[in-house]
Amino acid sequence: MARPKVYVTRIIPEPGLSMLKECCDVVVHESKDWPPSREELLRNIRDKDALLCLLTDKIDAEVMDAAPNLKVISTYSVGFDHIDIPEATKRGIYVTHTPGVLTDAVAEFTVGLILAVTRRIVEADKIIRTGQWDKPWNPYFLTGPELKGKTIGLVGLGRIGVATAKRLSSFDVKILYYDIERRWDVETVIPNMEFTDLDTLLEKSDIVSIHVPLTKETYHLINEERLRKMKKTAYLINTARGPVVDTEALVKALKEGWIAGAALDVFEQEPLPPNHPLTKFDNVVLAPHIASATIEARQRMAELAARNLIAVLKGEMPPALVNKEVLKVRPLEKVKMIP
């Protein structure tokens, strides 16, 4: 049996690449920083049985047309809105992702962003570096709110939402959460948690942190109408997906003082242009989509992405299948290439 041919759109951490090379013929786009051009992607995918891609790669019908042998798309990400899932399913192409392995990293980073924006840590650093610390200590200098006793609103209570709630509970806060269903199992473990509707969460929370996937339903979930419901003393945190927040409405909210500030790791446009309006606010902390950027998490993501891809080519159920409907279109035994 011929070895499967795999295209990897970026150099990924070990042990992911080594795992693939043990059982597949692998072509790698030799860059850590830049994705392949559209032309390069279409050219390299032609004879491949499998694709390992990143969220920077748009995988649509055109790509699938260029790859008639394609059996599995393994994305090195939790989100998969960069892949046309219905199209892949229709063609019998398995799509997998990497949930769970970056949960702790993103939850830790979320707490870090909350502290950074509320306690004005980035603003303080900038003041020292630009020579503006030119006055004696005074009791009002760079003050911000404590977390203790505050109400934290979590929009979405999946793996990352739960992990964030666990960490925040140690600050002696009240946690409101909104999700498509009530999580009794979590409420029994984490103290001071309350299930509520989205509008109530926005109206009562001192900090609103977003933890939902990007879908048609969550696109611009946080829009002008909902931003206006937040307290003027509240902060918005987003480590989920950029388009969940209407950027134009958020800029307006910050300019007009509807909210106290924001901390963002994701954006509707990535990379964010250096002259973007969001870069002009001292009460906004910005990060370049690095919430999962721990050494350990990125290694686990690579390993899971490789395991997903290899499992499908072995005719086995992958650890994290996105489109379960594909099993009815093309059973796993029909895509088996690795003994």
UniProtKB/Swiss-Prot annotation:
It catalyses: glycolate + NAD(+) = glyoxylate + NADH + H(+). It comes from Thermofilum pendens (strain DSM 2475 / Hrk 5). It is found in: Cytoplasm. GO terms for cellular component: cytosol. SUPFAM superfamilies: Formate/glycerate dehydrogenase catalytic domain-like, NAD(P)-binding Rossmann-fold domains. Keywords: Cytoplasm, NAD, Oxidoreductase. NADP(+) binds at residues 157-160, 239-241, 289-291. Belongs to the D-isomer specific 2-hydroxyacid dehydrogenase family. GyaR subfamily. This is Glyoxylate reductase. GO terms for molecular function: glyoxylate reductase (NADH) activity; glyoxylate reductase (NADPH) activity; hydroxypyruvate reductase [NAD(P)H] activity; NAD binding. The gene is gyaR. Pfam families: 2-Hacid_dh, 2-Hacid_dh_C. Its EC number is 1.1.1.26. Homodimer. Its main location: cytoplasm. The active site is at residues 241, 270, 289. HAMAP family: GyaR (MF_00776).
